[in-house]
Amino acid sequence: MKDTLFNKSLNKRFCFDEKVAHVFDDMLERSIPYYHEMLNLGAYFIAQNLKENIHPKPLPKPLIYDLGCSTGNFFIALNQQIQQDIELVGIDNSMPMLKKAQEKLKDFNNVRFECMDFLEVEFKEASAFSLLFVLQFVRPMQREVLLKKIYNSLALNGVLLVGEKIMSEDRILDKQMIELYYLYKQNQGYSHNEIAFKREALENVLVPYSLKENVALLESVGFKHVEAVFKWVNFTLLVARKT
């Protein structure tokens, strides 16, 4: 379904409710440059990590968490690239999103969804975690706590994927990057009003960090190897490995 949610001002802060869930896939594809390429790239690194079996004590059945899994797109990408027996757990606090995900992945028997606040979940030991365009919605004070919890739950040599919208630390460059991104959205069919109304709804809800800040945050919780494997203007995909 086409995203026309912001044809008029919502007069409220953005939230992942039923109206958003209905158009969310279209919103992602038209709002995140190279969205599917980043999903496939992230799935590749997790698949390679499992295939090369570089864990000192591999888990009997690799467990992968997708936090803020929304409509389950990343699990489709993972199942296309991973041949071995795995367990996929998607966690999201939006039931409308999870209903879409369950419908989309009903034919996969290795997927389980939980409607919970992932900040309150006690994770099992896992081979990989993904936070794809999710950390930017977590309150800044809680980000380090969440990442530390993920780090502690990762198996040795496990990986964390972090996809984020980012900002520049240079004021002029940041303005130019935002302007280019708005041009991108216009080319995807969004009007000036839709762009402005969405920006208004996301104010103080989506809080981006710079690339340097995100890397520093990951390093501060223990990750010694953090790589930006993809970047387009103000979007990036990071792979962090626990060693």
UniProtKB/Swiss-Prot annotation:
CDD domains: AdoMet_MTases. It catalyses: prephenate + S-adenosyl-L-methionine = carboxy-S-adenosyl-L-methionine + 3-phenylpyruvate + H2O. GO terms for molecular function: carboxyl- or carbamoyltransferase activity; S-adenosyl-L-methionine binding. InterPro entries: CmoA (IPR005271), Methyltransf_25 (IPR041698), SAM-dependent_MTases_sf (IPR029063). One of its GO terms (biological process) is tRNA wobble uridine modification. It is an enzyme of class 2 (transferase). Its EC number is 2.1.3.-. The keyword Transferase applies. Keywords: S-adenosyl-L-methionine, Transferase. S-adenosyl-L-methionine binds at residues 35, 68-70, 92-93, 199. It comes from the Bacteria. Homodimer. Belongs to the class I-like SAM-binding methyltransferase superfamily. Cx-SAM synthase family. HAMAP family: Cx_SAM_synthase. Catalyzes the conversion of S-adenosyl-L-methionine (SAM) to carboxy-S-adenosyl-L-methionine (Cx-SAM). This is Carboxy-S-adenosyl-L-methionine synthase. The gene is cmoA.
